[in-house]
């Protein structure tokens, strides 16, 4: 490709754009052509991911996890329920906010305040202490909150320093966050393909669909434990098809090319109703020991398709499930 097209949660000035700029500077965007890349702001995280599925973008940069509120549900749901996508890189940002206004506005003038819900949750205590009388209005991003101030729709906004600069606003208060170690993790998502090479400090992620029977979830998770693999996250999300049915997101330390991780994925493929591989990528995490693989079987062929970026390719004649 001559220009890599990357969709992200917009408009311009969001923390997501800042994360994308960091990934670009670190050389984490695959297949960047001679003409560089083109950033494309979208109105929502699902819109950014759907742009990749539809071919309008090569990659999407989206938030996936926050240290205060946990996982970003729209991102997880879209990755699990839509057609297959794969994570290729990640970065983490320290998150601090500014309270911004137009020039000439003081704290006493603030009657309405726009905030992205995730941002509002991270400055709730500060707002209660300093702007308790302001009416909180929702924004679909931090940059949109700043835009609402610039357009005169609200008096003030909780937003990022980048967005404030883009919209020519001034900060009444800067560096605001209730928890001093607030951080958000962002991922770069594309169509399925060969994962980045193993670095020794990698993360692997998958979504498990498990039959509703006693002991099935414990048995699935045991495939990691018996191999000494560190699970860094497990989370359930509703399938959206029937009440009381769930998908399970798991993140582990390691790479699909680590023997123990490969064996765990193959065991899950045999055991679970479905396994959606979300990728293996550099994440700064230490890995455990590796082992030599056993002779090939259907699960080995399935794993080979994941490594080749072809998760939907049919099994060879005589093979098991897809």
Curated annotation (Swiss-Prot):
Cross-referenced Gene3D superfamilies: 3.30.70.260, Periplasmic binding protein-like II (3.40.190.10)
Species, as recorded: Mycobacterium leprae (strain TN)
Protein name: Prephenate dehydratase
Residue ranges occupied by any Prephenate dehydratase domain in the UniProt entry: 5-191
Class of this enzyme: lyase
Enzyme Commission number: 4.2.1.51
CDD domains reported for this sequence: ACT_CM-PDT, PBP2_Aa-PDT_like
Subunit comment: Homodimer.
Pathway this chain belongs to: Amino-acid biosynthesis; L-phenylalanine biosynthesis; phenylpyruvate from prephenate: step 1/1
Keywords: Amino-acid biosynthesis, Aromatic amino acid biosynthesis, Lyase, Phenylalanine biosynthesis
Spans annotated as Disordered: 286-322
């Amino acid at each position: 490709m001559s220009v890599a097209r990357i969709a992200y949660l917009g408009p311009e000035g969001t923390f997501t754009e800042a994360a994308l700029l960091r990934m670009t500077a670190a050389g984490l965007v695959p297949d960047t052509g001679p003409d560089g890349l083109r950033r494309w702001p979208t109105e929502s995280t699902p819109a950014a991911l759907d742009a990749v599925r539809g071919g309008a973008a090569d990659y999407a940069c989206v938030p996936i996890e926050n240290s205060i509120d946990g996982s970003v549900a729209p991102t997880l749901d879209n990755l699990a329920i839509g057609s297959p996508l794969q994570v290729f890189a990640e970065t983490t940002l320290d998150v601090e906010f500014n309270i911004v206004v137009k020039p000439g506005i003081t704290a006493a003038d603030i009657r309405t305040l726009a905030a992205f819900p995730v941002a509002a949750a991270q400055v709730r205590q500060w707002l209660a202490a300093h702007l308790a009388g302001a009416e909180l209005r929702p924004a679909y991003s931090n940059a949109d909150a700043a835009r609402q101030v610039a357009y005169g729709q609200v008096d003030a906004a909780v937003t990022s320093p980048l967005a404030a600069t883009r919209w020519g606003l001034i900060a009444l208060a800067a560096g605001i966050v209730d928890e001093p170690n607030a951080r958000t993790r962002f991922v770069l998502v594309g169509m399925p393909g060969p994962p980045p090479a193993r670095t020794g400090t990698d993360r692997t992620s998958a979504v498990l669909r498990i039959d509703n029977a006693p002991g099935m979830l414990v048995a699935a998770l045991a495939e990691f434990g018996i191999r000494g693999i560190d699970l860094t996250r497990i989370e359930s999300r509703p399938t959206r098809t029937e009440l009381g049915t769930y998908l399970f997101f798991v993140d582990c330390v390691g790479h699909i090319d680590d023997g123990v991780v490969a064996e765990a994925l193959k065991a899950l493929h045999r055991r679970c109703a479905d396994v959606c591989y979300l990728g293996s990528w550099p994440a700064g995490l230490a890995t455990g020991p590796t082992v030599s693989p056993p002779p090939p079987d259907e699960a080995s062929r399935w794993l080979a398709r994941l490594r080749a970026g072809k998760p939907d390719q049919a099994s060879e004649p005589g093979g098991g499930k897809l």
